[in-house]
């Protein structure tokens, strides 16, 4: 089906393709840029940035292993009491 058959004689026609402003040579040639890819900044090895080591932080050990359980139970109980008081 051609555009003439699709649109008929109603005066509707597809818009002509728009040309870029200024034609194909609109953008000026780039200057003062290296042509050969990316150079790493000075002070780093040629391979790029040094690999970072993961940091491990040791958590302090609780002296009473049951203390965390008690604290969790008390927190849950306090939360339930607060909800009961609100409703």
Curated annotation (Swiss-Prot):
- Tell me where it resides: Cell membrane; Cell tip
Species for this entry? Schizosaccharomyces pombe (strain 972 / ATCC 24843)
Q: Which named protein is this?
A: Lipid-anchored plasma membrane protein uvi15
Its record classes its membrane topology as:
Lipid-anchor
Q: Spell out the Low complexity composition-biased ranges.
A: 18-41
What functional role does this protein have? Required for the maintenance of viability of cells in stationary phase and in starvation conditions.
**Post-translation: what modifications?**
Palmitoylated.
User: Where does the chain cross the membrane?
Assistant: none
Q: Which family does it belong to?
A: Belongs to the CYSTM1 family.
Region entry Disordered: which residue ranges? 1-64
Give GO cellular component annotations, separated by semicolons.
Answer: cell division site; cell tip; plasma membrane
Induction or repression: By UV light, alkylating agents and heat shock.
Classification lineage: Eukaryota, Fungi, Dikarya, Ascomycota, Taphrinomycotina
Keyword entries, A-Z: Cell membrane, Lipoprotein, Membrane, Stress response
Q: Write down the InterPro entries for this protein, in alphabetical order.
A: CYSTM_dom
């Amino acid at each position: 089906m051609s555009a003439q058959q699709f649109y008929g004689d109603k005066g509707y026609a597809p818009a002509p393709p728009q040309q870029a402003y200024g034609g194909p040579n609109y953008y000026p040639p780039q200057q003062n840029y290296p042509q050969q890819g990316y150079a790493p900044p000075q002070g780093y090895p040629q391979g790029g940035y040094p690999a970072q080591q993961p940091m491990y932080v040791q958590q302090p050990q609780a002296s009473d292993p049951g203390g965390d359980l008690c604290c969790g139970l008390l927190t849950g109980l306090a939360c339930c009491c607060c909800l009961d008081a609100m409703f």
